[in-house]
């Protein structure tokens, strides 16, 4: 259990890693636009980590777009030579998943971002439902809760939107993601020196990442934040990053584009 629970010094390092990671993710978000190369966005993230005082990235940034956001192509995009770079195109979504390293401790944070700066109507509805489910799941995180319990709350919130979902994409997403076997990479993982599978019940004092990963109709949806588990709940360690489609569009609209 000790490997999962951080002492005060370790938590200070994780807080610093989280803070610099927020800066790096926003920098990456601001660099995304039609025609930009995946590698350019990744280099912006790497530079932002260093410029904010971190020791670079703790893993190579993920900024896959389009079909490369869907398993297994997202992993291929990291590992195979013919998928290592791609020009981003309007209408695509980007999986932006980044982390800065501070004194060997990991930051880890992510959002799903529209290349054009605007979601399509069906992407917007689907993403906002995904976000609502995320917030519901995050709200139950506390000491003693299991990963399966958090998933069931997330799932229940998805299903609550089924009757009012308007687009075929959102309806298909809810029907698919509400079956556990269709979201095999939906996860909560421990974060400190390395990412790791958490114990059966989350202990107080552990830093975790809440990271639902899902896809539907060739589009990936991904959201991730860092939390400190306490007896009363979970403290968000990565505040300051927009969630909803409208908030993300506003952030991208007012970004100073390179």
PLM features: what roles do these ranges have?
Residues 1-258:
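Active-site neighborhoods and metal-handling regions in enzymes and metal-associated proteins
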């Amino acid at each position: 259990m000790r490997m999962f629970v951080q002492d005060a010094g370790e938590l200070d390092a994780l807080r610093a890693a989280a803070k610099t990671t927020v800066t790096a993710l926003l920098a990456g978000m601001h660099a995304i636009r039609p025609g930009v190369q995946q590698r350019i966005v990744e280099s912006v993230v790497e530079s932002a980590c260093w410029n904010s005082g971190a020791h670079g990235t703790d893993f190579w940034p993920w900024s896959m777009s389009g079909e490369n956001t869907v398993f297994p192509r997202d992993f291929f995009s990291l590992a195979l030579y013919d998928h290592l770079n791609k020009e981003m195109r309007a209408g695509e979504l980007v999986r932006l998943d980044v982390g800065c390293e501070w004194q060997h401790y990991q930051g880890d944070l992510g959002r799903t971002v529209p290349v054009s700066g605007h979601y399509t109507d069906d992407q917007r509805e689907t993403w906002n439902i995904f976000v609502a489910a995320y917030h519901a799941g995050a709200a139950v995180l506390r000491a003693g809760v299991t990963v399966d319990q958090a998933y069931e709350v997330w799932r229940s919130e998805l299903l609550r939107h089924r009757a009012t979902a308007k687009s075929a994409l959102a309806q298909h997403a809810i029907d698919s993601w509400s079956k556990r076997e269709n979201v095999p990479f939906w996860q909560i993982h421990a974060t400190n020196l390395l990412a790791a599978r958490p114990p059966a019940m989350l202990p107080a004092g552990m830093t975790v990442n809440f990271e639902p990963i899902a896809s539907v109709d060739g589009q990936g949806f991904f959201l991730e934040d860092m939390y400190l588990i306490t007896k009363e709940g979970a403290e968000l360690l990565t505040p300051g990053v927009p969630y909803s489609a409208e908030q993300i569009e506003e952030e991208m609209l007012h970004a100073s584009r390179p």
